[in-house]
Amino acid sequence: MSYLVTIIAFIIVFGVLVTVHEYGHMFFAKRAGIMCPEFAIGMGPKIFSFRKNETLYTIRLLPVGGYVRMAGDGLEEPPVEPGMNVKIKLNEENEITHIILDDHHKFQQIEAIEVKKCDFKDDLFIEGITAYDNERHHFKIARKSFFVENGSLVQIAPRDRQFAHKKPWPKFLTLFAGPLFNFILALVLFIGLAYYQGTPTSTVEQVADKYPAQQAGLQKGDKIVQIGKYKISEFDDVDKALDKVKDNKTTVKFERDGKTKSVELTPKKTEKKLTKVSSETKYVLGFQPASEHTLFKPIVFGFKSFLIGSTYIFTAVVGMLASIFTGGFSFDMLNGPVGIYHNVDSVVKAGIISLIGYTALLSVNLGIMNLIPIPALDGGRILFVIYEAIFRKPVNKKAETTIIAIGAIFMVVIMILVTWNDIRRYFL
């Protein structure tokens, strides 16, 4: 049963993170007028799909990513060229609405035509010889029109609906929006957790065994007001004061039953592992703070949690990249789907709150990792847009596509190595 719970939790976490990321791309793409033929969650064979307006929404078998396919985001060419024989369906204005490439269709009242000239990007027309009168005709293509092959519809994308032909700013927004939406999701989750759990105060809720707070006699309900020379008004002040006092003997003042008392104690030094490549030294008294539920403090606390988590993850990612050049790199620094599954298994056992917190951190991590300037990632593609903005011309399309393909192969190889390393670490 625990495996089933972990699998369900993993699928939900993965689905939420990828859906939010890809929706960010699609949201800004559509705002810029870019046609998005497909929105996919997962990779590999399609297991479910539905069409809404011009976009086909699909869920695919392998939980290793997702994508938004945008018109003009590659070297794909229209499947029709002069010399081909196709069938066309016309509307009441005598405009082409469907170009049928085979006999696997259910359309009626269609015309067969041998294509002599055609343009699917700018002038939108087909000129050719029709079978019914063996005469040459010129047909305009409707703005909303489709290629039909094997029963599937692919909407024709004029040049002004293609990603490649947009200005740098909408391109940048479209590419950056994926990571941006991951950051927004993380922030919302952190704030939501703060509202649910309340924000910590400087009042003691519970003391830990064999820690300085217990040894000094602190009790539930004691409100800490000063540590050394540092005044305390909220829980963050406790952490800040202890960072300065470190593990030196100090005086702690607290209020109990309306009276101010003081004790001397020595904070305990602890090491908290944040990621595979970074840890944090903290000095603690060893007490769990009481929480309060207010209207605005959770927003501030959520922002703080987001900034702290983002800083730690950014530092870890920079450290990992630096280790590639300094010789300290290890695949243990990375987690693939198998490693994330293992982490989810551990977090699920701690409860739904821990799972939500882990999802928030994972969302930040996904956003930051996608901004690494590797051609197949959002960060690498943003570099191409920056080049276009600076030099007032886009990177050669063939060169860009080749570089992105090399980057994609590199990422696939890395993913395979990371996955094998995760399997070896956790299951062998």
UniProtKB/Swiss-Prot annotation:
<feature type="transmembrane region" description="Helical">
    <location>
        <begin position="309"/>
        <end position="331"/>
    </location>
</feature>
<dbReference type="GO" id="GO:0006508">
    <property type="term" value="P:proteolysis"/>
</dbReference>
<dbReference type="GO" id="GO:0046872">
    <property type="term" value="F:metal ion binding"/>
</dbReference>
<dbReference type="InterPro" id="IPR036034">
    <property type="entry name" value="PDZ_sf"/>
</dbReference>
<feature type="active site">
    <location>
        <position position="22"/>
    </location>
</feature>
<keyword id="KW-0378">Hydrolase</keyword>
<feature type="binding site">
    <location>
        <position position="21"/>
    </location>
    <ligand>
        <name>Zn(2+)</name>
    </ligand>
</feature>
<keyword id="KW-0645">Protease</keyword>
<keyword id="KW-0862">Zinc</keyword>
<dbReference type="GO" id="GO:0004222">
    <property type="term" value="F:metalloendopeptidase activity"/>
</dbReference>
<keyword id="KW-1003">Cell membrane</keyword>
<keyword id="KW-0812">Transmembrane</keyword>
<dbReference type="InterPro" id="IPR008915">
    <property type="entry name" value="Peptidase_M50"/>
</dbReference>
<keyword id="KW-1133">Transmembrane helix</keyword>
<keyword id="KW-0482">Metalloprotease</keyword>
<dbReference type="InterPro" id="IPR004387">
    <property type="entry name" value="Pept_M50_Zn"/>
</dbReference>
<feature type="domain" description="PDZ">
    <location>
        <begin position="186"/>
        <end position="269"/>
    </location>
</feature>
<keyword id="KW-0472">Membrane</keyword>
<feature type="transmembrane region" description="Helical">
    <location>
        <begin position="401"/>
        <end position="420"/>
    </location>
</feature>
<feature type="transmembrane region" description="Helical">
    <location>
        <begin position="172"/>
        <end position="194"/>
    </location>
</feature>
<protein>
    <recommendedName>
        <fullName>Putative zinc metalloprotease SACOL1281</fullName>
        <ecNumber>3.4.24.-</ecNumber>
    </recommendedName>
</protein>
<dbReference type="Pfam" id="PF13180">
    <property type="entry name" value="PDZ_2"/>
</dbReference>
<dbReference type="Pfam" id="PF02163">
    <property type="entry name" value="Peptidase_M50"/>
</dbReference>
<dbReference type="GO" id="GO:0005886">
    <property type="term" value="C:plasma membrane"/>
</dbReference>
<dbReference type="InterPro" id="IPR001478">
    <property type="entry name" value="PDZ"/>
</dbReference>
<keyword id="KW-0479">Metal-binding</keyword>
<feature type="transmembrane region" description="Helical">
    <location>
        <begin position="352"/>
        <end position="374"/>
    </location>
</feature>
<feature type="binding site">
    <location>
        <position position="25"/>
    </location>
    <ligand>
        <name>Zn(2+)</name>
    </ligand>
</feature>
<comment type="similarity">
    <text>Belongs to the peptidase M50B family.</text>
</comment>
